[in-house]
Design a protein with these regions (language model features):
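Short, proline-enriched alpha-helix->beta-strand connector loops that line the catalytic pocket
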Residues: 120-124, 172-179
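Primarily recognizes the serine-hydrolase "nucleophile elbow" in alpha/beta-hydrolase
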Residues: 65-141
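Conserved alpha/beta-hydrolase
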Residues: 26-47
Length: 250
């Protein structure tokens, strides 16, 4: 089973992005991987709600936790659908979706984002694409993002170091999880430094572990499209499919 979390940069100032916007991608992923795909919504920060982190990630955690006891479509009967297995999850986070998943799967020191051990046990692999991980570094590259969405989402702070996924440690019970960090050379909204930092951080966390750094992969060469355009590319589907097949057959 795959759960896909697509980024809306946390905020909604013009158009509310919705899960239905990614229906075609979900169908392509399901067909390519022969597994169910779930694309959830989560609350967005808007001028009328003043919603701030970690509320968005809490929505994600609530959804993931509920999947552990969900019987699946049609009460769990596979029929013509791919079988739903809540004990075998692959999570896919794009843009801020990557930051939300990292804040849950890694130790963000936020009591509101502590996942149940059953969820951590169920996660087999994680795909991070065009992700945001280090907010201070992001603002160094894109200073206008502070006014666009960072201040509304995280507050007006002198530093956002405490929210940096590149500083978070492994949670107990996550050493079995495999990761792949994907970044397109054509992304104009999030620079490659974000993915480079996260890749090296995850490698350092897994150094000396049961599988070593071999369970932390990267793909920074195959995608050429812009930030969200890569989601419509066949190459992106192939990268996700190959990663899931590799982890599943290990």
């Amino acid at each position: 089973m795959q759960c896909n979390f697509f980024g809306s940069l946390y905020v909604s100032k013009i158009k509310r992005e919705d899960k239905k916007d990614h229906a075609a991608l979900a169908r392509s992923l399901a067909a390519s991987t022969a597994s169910p795909v779930i694309v959830p919504n989560y609350r967005l920060t808007a001028p009328d709600n003043e919603l701030q982190h970690p509320a968005h990630a809490q929505d994600v955690l609530e959804l993931l936790t509920s999947l552990l006891s969900w019987s699946g479509p049609r009460g769990g009967a596979c029929q013509s659908l791919p079988c739903y297995d809540p004990n075998r999850m692959f999570l896919i986070g794009h843009s801020c979706g990557a930051h939300m998943l990292a804040s849950i799967l890694l130790d963000s020191s936020d009591p509101a984002l502590v996942p149940p051990v059953e969820l951590l046990r169920a996660v087999r692999g994680v795909v991070f694409a065009e992700g945001i991980y280090d907010i201070d570094a992001l603002l160094m590259s894109f200073p206008t993002y502070r006014d666009w969405f960072i201040r509304d989402t995280f507050g007006d702070l002198p530093t956002y170091d405490r929210y940096s996924a590149t500083k978070m440690t492994l949670r107990e019970g996550t050493t079995h999880i495999s990761w792949i960090i994907v970044h397109s050379g054509g992304d104009t909204l999030v620079d490659a430094l974000q993915s480079q930092e996260m890749y090296h951080h995850l490698q350092s966390l897994h150094q000396g572990g049961p599988q070593g750094t071999g369970q932390v992969l990267k793909n920074w060469d195959d995608l050429k499209g812009d930030h969200s355009a890569i989601l419509q590319s066949g190459k992106y589907i192939q990268i996700v499919r190959d990663f899931i097949h590799m982890v599943s057959s290990a």
